[in-house]
A protein has these predicted regions:
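Hydrophobic, aromatic-enriched alpha-helical segments typical of multi-pass transmembrane helices
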Residues: 1-173
Length: 173
């Protein structure tokens, strides 16, 4: 692993990502059980907003970590945060489908931003593959909720969550 990587900052970012992944998994299960309409409910909107609130601190920690290929993160993460914020606001204010589509679009940048984390940690920990594969599966599975088939996103998020937990454990040694 790059000797200039700030391990504690990476661990802090991973911890925030774990909290987000747990909250996302809970939301994904509810969306599968109650349908996409759940995203328009007050509790669904609050859950999505709380998840969104975790993205700036996670991004801050990752920005300060000296990751390899950090430019990928520094471009993709703010795009993800901004597009998702617009989608959340649009969903909350209009209840229109475009809002959810923007949220899904914003989340397409999440695994792209995660490439910097993956490239930094892959030699140190093969479990980083779980993280990145899970992130891509989760993201690619999100549009399937529009067809009442959210299982790929749930499995992807669970794999990503497992990878994050293993990475934290390995880095904390």
């Amino acid at each position: 692993m790059n000797p200039f990587v700030r391990t504690q900052s990476v661990i802090s970012g991973l911890r925030v990502s774990v909290v987000a992944a747990v909250l996302i998994l809970a939301l994904l299960v509810q969306l599968q059980l109650f349908g996409v309409r759940y995203a328009y409910s007050l509790s669904g909107l609050i859950q999505m907003f709380v998840i969104w609130l975790l993205s700036p601190p996670a991004t801050y920690f990752y920005f300060n970590s000296n990751l390899d290929k950090a430019l990928i993160l520094k471009v993709a993460a703010p795009l993800a945060i901004a597009v998702t914020a617009v989608g959340l606001l649009y969903t909350a204010l209009t209840g229109g489908l475009l809002g959810l589509e923007l949220i899904v679009l914003g989340y397409l940048f999440e695994p792209i931003a995660g490439i910097s984390i993956f490239l930094t940690l892959r030699e140190f920990s093969p479990e980083s593959y779980m993280f990145i594969v899970g992130a891509f599966a989760y993201t690619l599975g999100l549009p399937l909720y529009f067809f009442d088939f959210g299982y790929l996103a749930m499995i992807g998020d669970a794999v990503k969550l497992s990878g994050l937990l293993i990475l934290i454990r390995r880095l904390s040694r």
